[in-house]
């Protein structure tokens, strides 16, 4: 008797980018820290009835092949290959979230300095005691207000707020990592990949390959006290030889 246990391994090999260009040297991708994976086959069933309660015949109609996976590893590079198929760039966006307050000085202005190698790209707000937000204005801030100069990364405050403790959050970029600007492409433009699911338990193996998958969902949900597990969904279709899926097992 053959059974399976565990989440298995899922390999995705990009075949085509969103512009329809074949990948010259496809690089297989192993979805990391797999939580669960599935391949589903469903069919429409048409029933023929006469005057009695039960069908006199039934026939299979259209079929549908779908897949889904939940994997904890976060990779913009992988997401681009499997979901977007667009142009990946170097660099990433980071956020400085203040957990220690600083007093508004006598000069009424604070210049923020990002970590070494970082470039400030935007204001993410100022908070006072109890998390009460200050209101950003264009000029002449009053009590509880501030201005932000994007050119000099300077926050300015009202004279009445001198000495008040504030938390300042901002956004900055660094040269490391990856980034992706997702464009609004015409309908029908999407990457294609081959999917392979492999399960091994007690010396016996189960293998499923789908030659063509297109993604139809990427979900990222956070939890207060748990890991973020991105989930994917995809739809399969036949290759040029009419093969929809390939299965193998010990039994």
Predicted regions and their residues:
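Extracellular interaction modules
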Residues: 62-66, 157-167
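Short, hydrophobic/aromatic-enriched beta-strand segments in well-ordered soluble domains
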Residues: 70-72, 164-173
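Strand-loop-strand motifs at the edges of beta-sheets in extracellular beta-sandwich domains
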Residues: 145-160
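Residue-level recognition of well-ordered beta-strand positions that form the cores
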Residues: 68-70, 169, 198, 233-235
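Extended beta-strand solenoid/passenger and fiber regions
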Residues: 76-145, 171-203
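Mixed-charge, glycine-accented linear interaction segment located at domain edges/termini
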Residues: 129, 156-160, 205-251
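Short, surface-exposed beta-strand/loop "edge" segments at domain boundaries and coil↔beta transitions
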Residues: 19-22, 77, 162-165, 176, ...
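Solvent-exposed edge beta-strands and adjacent loop segments
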Residues: 1-82, 205-231
């Amino acid at each position: 008797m053959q059974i399976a246990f565990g989440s298995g391994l899922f390999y995705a090999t990009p075949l085509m980018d969103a512009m329809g260009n074949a990948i010259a040297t496809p690089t297989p991708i192993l979805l990391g820290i797999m939580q669960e994976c599935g391949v589903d086959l469903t069919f429409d069933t048409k029933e023929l009835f006469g005057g009695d309660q039960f069908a006199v015949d039934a026939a299979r109609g259209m079929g549908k092949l779908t897949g889904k996976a939940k994997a904890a590893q976060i990779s913009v590079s992988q997401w681009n290959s499997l979901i977007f198929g667009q142009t990946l760039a170097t660099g990433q966006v980071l956020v400085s979230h203040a957990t220690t307050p600083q007093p508004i000085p006598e000069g009424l202005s604070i210049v923020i300095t990002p970590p070494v190698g970082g470039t400030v790209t935007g204001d993410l707000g100022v908070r006072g005691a109890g998390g009460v937000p200050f209101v950003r204005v264009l000029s002449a801030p009053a009590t509880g207000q501030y201005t932000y100069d994007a050119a000099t990364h300077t926050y300015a405050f009202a004279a009445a707020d001198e000495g008040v403790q504030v938390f300042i959050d901002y956004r900055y970029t660094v040269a490391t990592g990856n980034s992706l600007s997702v464009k609004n492409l015409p309908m029908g433009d999407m990457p294609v990949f081959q999917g392979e699911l492999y399960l091994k338990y007690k010396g016996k193996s189960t293998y499923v390959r789908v030659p063509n998958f297109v993604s139809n969902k990427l979900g990222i949900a956070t939890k207060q006290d748990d890991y973020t597990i991105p989930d994917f969904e995809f739809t399969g279709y036949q290759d040029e030889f009419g093969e929809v899926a390939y299965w193998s097992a010990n039994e």
